[in-house]
Amino acid sequence: VELTGEEKAAVLALWDKVDEDKVGGEALGRLLVVYPWTQRFFDSFGDLSTAAAVMGNPKVKAHGKKVLHSFGDGVHHLDDLKVTFAQLSELHCDKLHVDPENFRLLGNVLVVVLAQQFGKAFTPELQAAYQKVVAGVANALAHKYH
């Protein structure tokens, strides 16, 4: 990811304030509500029939937490995202057959959730830096696709 030193510092400073457990469930839940076709990868999660069911689903929250912990690993390894996400890329490509476009969608949803959580502290400059980060993570996750 091409970030200036200032952008990296700002991304890391904000990330240290992120409640990964809460934000992860919120971001994944929103993805599943706004882009309902992504639900097909989560058949084992039970009731995803309404927005309220999705947002209150404990399996969605648990998986969102896991996703955001992995994203946090990426935030701390911005210069080596392909290596950081190599195993997850392989898993999502070869075993789960997830459309890599879903990584971009989730990244964009995450930026919205961060903006909601941090309000005015999530400046336009910080948003631009996070857009670069989520794009880099999405590209790293799509790396193993043929």
UniProtKB/Swiss-Prot annotation:
Gene Ontology molecular function: haptoglobin binding; heme binding; hemoglobin alpha binding; metal ion binding; organic acid binding; oxygen binding; oxygen carrier activity; peroxidase activity
Tissue-by-tissue expression: Red blood cells.
Annotated Gene3D superfamilies: Globins
Residues recorded with modification N6-succinyllysine: 17, 59
Pfam families hit by this protein: Globin
Phosphoserine found at: 44
Modification Asymmetric dimethylarginine, positions: 104
Domain Globin: from-to ranges: 2-146
GO CC, alphabetical: blood microparticle; haptoglobin-hemoglobin complex; hemoglobin complex
Keyword terms, alphabetized: Acetylation, Heme, Iron, Metal-binding, Methylation, Oxygen transport, Phosphoprotein, Transport
Residues the record lists as Phosphothreonine modifications: 123
InterPro entries according to UniProt: Globin, Globin-like_sf, Globin/Proto, Hemoglobin_b, Hemoglobin_oxygen_transport
Superkingdom of this protein's organism: Eukaryota
Keyword Cell cycle set for record: no
Residues reported in the UniProt entry to bind heme b: 63, 92
GO process terms (BP): hydrogen peroxide catabolic process
Subunit structure: Heterotetramer of two alpha chains and two beta chains.
Family: Belongs to the globin family.
Functional summary from the UniProt entry: Involved in oxygen transport from the lung to the various peripheral tissues.
Protein name: Hemoglobin subunit beta-1
Species annotation: Tapirus terrestris (Lowland tapir)
Gene: HBB1
